[in-house]
Amino acid sequence: MKTLSSVLTGLCLIGLFNASESYATPTEPQPDVQALASSPQWLTTKVYIEGAPQVDVKANYPGVVGISMWDPQRNRYEFFHADTGLSKYADGGGGYFLVTGDQNTHILVPDVGPVKTVVRRLEKLDKNEFTYSREVPRDMVAGNPPVRIYVVHTPYIGPIKTALSN
């Protein structure tokens, strides 16, 4: 019995110290929703259409351009005009947000306005960049064919100070 116990203990130790790396699969770093808290404000720095990242089309998509604030502790967000700092809350620019468990989808639930949810694909999220994509009508004009836009944000360090309404 003592021999069997010694053999089993030895096999367990060999297994622990010689663990096969073939079982480990490398994964892409996952976005961390807490990275939204790394900057008090985020500024839209670029908008581009899928397949054309070199062409900035911010001027065609003013509804997605501005300063945003995110509170991951309360899951609250709010958008502001980049030129004035005025809130877009009354126009549906504030409410709750969530990131799905797989860290791939970013969902907004505005407090007010006709839109009930906005589903966005989370492309990149770290302390230096927050990028999402979603399908919208080209140039945000109803009836135009859908395109996937990518909206890139970086931490805002300008003079405009904003605060969440709720």
Predicted regions and their residues:
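Bacterial N-terminal signal peptides
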Residues: 9-18
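Bacterial N-terminal signal peptides that target proteins for export
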Residues: 1-8
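Lipid interaction determinants
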Residues: 22-92, 104-166
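Extracellular/luminal ectodomains and secreted, surface-exposed scaffolds of diverse proteins
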Residues: 93-100
